[in-house]
Regions:
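Flexible, charged surface loops at secondary-structure boundaries
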Residues: 1-3, 35-40, 71-74, 112-114, ...
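N-terminal module-boundary/linker segments of secreted carbohydrate-active enzymes
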Residues: 1-43, 152-155
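Short, acidic/polar
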Residues: 17-37, 55-65, 100-105, 173-184
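Aromatic- and acid-rich polysaccharide-binding/catalytic face
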Residues: 39-51, 179-196
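Substrate-binding cleft of extracellular glycoside hydrolase catalytic domains
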Residues: 46-166
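Short, catalytically relevant binding-site loops at active-site mouths
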Residues: 167-171
Length: 196
């Protein structure tokens, strides 16, 4: 926005007291969260593994389910937390190329522009030792650019948003693992996000 910030959340059902759940078994507790904080979310984050067998239709179903309006009367942004399950060297070498081609072709074919752009947040917190793709900035950058180039070739980057999102603190806190080393470059990133 021109001023302020977008209020978003990843509101899973766990953490809510059973009486607060009001009988809900929904995995994404959007209504409960909004009731708790007294605001409507402008953005919702949902995770999906970046691996063969997963597809855009799964995410589009979730998006349609939680597609609502924020306090400004605009539709919520839907942020896809896309998590690789293989090391960055394998991604940089093209092991996910077929997956990305298939996934982005599906995005291009199913894109519903009335719902607004899709916000892709691939391989976030790459500077944190808890991810399988941390500790290799050179190959991370190659992998990101490779993925982005495929999306661009299929026309997905013209309308959708790619969010680069490191952790606020690098762990380990070495110079080699500094978040700046993982940055793919302005040509490959639309927005910056930080996990705190």
């Amino acid at each position: 926005p021109e001023k302020g910030c977008y209020h978003g959340a990843f509101p899973p059902l766990y953490g809510f007291d059973p009486e607060d759940r009001e009988g809900s078994t929904d995995q994404c507790a959007v209504a409960l969260f909004e009731k708790l904080v007294g605001k409507q979310l402008s953005m919702i984050l949902w995770y999906q593994n970046m691996e063969p067998g997963r597809n855009f239709s799964e995410m589009q179903t979730v998006r349609e389910k939680y597609w609502g309006k924020n306090y400004q009367g605009k539709y919520r942004f839907f942020l896809y937390g896309w998590l690789p399950v293989i090391p960055t060297q394998q991604m940089a070498n093209g092991e996910l190329d077929d997956f990305h081609k298939s996934y982005f072709a599906e995005v291009a074919a199913q894109e519903v522009r009335d719902m607004g752009p899709i916000w892709f947040r691939p391989a976030n917190e790459m500077n944190g030792s808890w991810t399988p793709y941390y500790g290799d900035p050179t190959n991370y950058v190659k992998a990101w650019r490779r993925m982005y180039n495929i999306a661009e070739q299929l026309g997905v980057t013209a309308y959708n948003v790619f969010v680069w999102s490191p952790n606020s603190v690098s762990m380990p806190g070495t110079e080699a693992n500094a978040m700046k080393n993982y940055y793919p470059g302005d040509m490959y990133v639309d927005w910056l996000g930080v996990s705190c």
